[in-house]
Structures are given as C-alpha cells and as structure tokens.
Amino acid sequence: MKVAVAALAVLLCAMALCSQVFSAPFGADTPTACCFSYVARQLSRKIVADYFETSSQCSKPGVIFQTKKGRQVCANPTEDWVQEYITDLELNA
C-alpha cells in the first residue's frame, strides 16, 4: 500500500512538472514589448533618448521611443516624424 501511494505521489509530481514546461513560451524569441496602440501626436524630439523596433512576432509593427525620463512610448513606424527621429538617433549614436 505504501509503495502504491509513493508511486502515485511521484507520478503526480512528474505530471505537474511536465504541464509547467509545456505551458511555458517556446524559444528565446518571445517578444518582450509590443505596441497595441500608437501615440496620438508627435513627441518632442528633445525628450527622446533612444528607440527600438518591436518584434516581427507582434500583431502590429511599432517603434518604441525611450524618453530621457525612462518612459516608453509606442509610435507608428509609417509616420514621417518617426522615421526622421530614427534617422537622427542613428546618426547621433
């Protein structure tokens, strides 16, 4: 009887571990930041410190600007001002 209870406990623990592994996201390419909406108006160039583009795995393309105060703001990559800021940041990097 003790053997059956011990075997059942081991089986339950193994099942719990397996379910956690399979429910976790696969791969290291899981996007960490995606844009679901964009800023409504142009940011002041003076407050923008850096940028990065969202992953291609995100549902919408986006550019995330990092402000000098550490805030992250999503912008539409097709807008002219966004492309100008990216060019300026690249040239001054």
Swiss-Prot record:
Gene3D superfamilies: 2.40.50.40
Keywords tagged on the record: Chemotaxis, Cytokine, Disulfide bond, Inflammatory response, Secreted, Signal
Biological process, per Gene Ontology: antimicrobial humoral immune response mediated by antimicrobial peptide; astrocyte cell migration; calcium ion transport; calcium-mediated signaling; cell activation; cell chemotaxis; cell-cell signaling; chemokine-mediated signaling pathway
Residues annotated as signal peptide: 1-24
Family annotation (CDD domains): Chemokine_CC
One MF term in the entry's GO annotations: protein kinase activity
Subcellular location(s) of the protein: Secreted
Domain of life: Eukaryota
Coiled-coil ranges from the UniProt annotation: none
Record's GO cellular component terms: cytoplasm; cytosol; extracellular space
Disulfide bonds: C34-C58, C35-C74
Subunit composition and interactions: Self-associates. Also heterodimer of MIP-1-alpha(4-69) and MIP-1-beta(3-69). Interacts with CCR1.
Family: Belongs to the intercrine beta (chemokine CC) family.
Function: Monokine with inflammatory and chemokinetic properties. Binds to CCR1, CCR4 and CCR5. One of the major HIV-suppressive factors produced by CD8+ T-cells. Recombinant MIP-1-alpha induces a dose-dependent inhibition of different strains of HIV-1, HIV-2, and simian immunodeficiency virus (SIV).
Annotated protein name in UniProt: C-C motif chemokine 3
